[in-house]
Amino acid sequence: MTKRTRTLLGSLAAAAMISLVPMSGANADGYWQCVPFARLMSGIQIFGDARTWWSQAAGKYDTGSAPKIGAVLSFKPTARMNLGHVAFVSQVLTDRVIQVTHANWSVIEGDRGQIEKDVTVVDVSDRKSVV
């Protein structure tokens, strides 16, 4: 199977999975958090706050700085985002531009806990500082 075929199949599988998730962002309590959504989309069985995903993945899952469809992008915690954030990589446009599908990032129509599809993310980091 060629790389292009694998990429296409991965994209189709991701699209099929996304189509099964209600875009209103409703889980049992009507509100999506990023962690259960990323786990549902990726199949990666890591639990706990988003800020712990990178360290928990070590030795269990492939990790790196090269984007791949189906991977989970892990954001380090910051002062405003102290639990970190995780997002499902839905498209790779270039080595520094991807699209993610994630939950509980933006306030949409006054509500948090919503799902956003194919949001563009640009890597502006100094490559030397990327793990």
Predicted feature locations:
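A mature extracytoplasmic/lumenal domain signature
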Residues: P77-A79, Q91-L93, H102-S106, D123-S125
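Bacterial N-terminal signal peptides that target proteins for export
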Residues: T2-L12
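C-terminal segment of classical bacterial N-terminal signal peptides
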Residues: M17-G25
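Solvent-exposed, flexible loop/coil residues
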Residues: T5, A57-A58, V119, D123-S125
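Conserved small/polar residues in nucleotide/adenosyl-binding loops
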Residues: V130
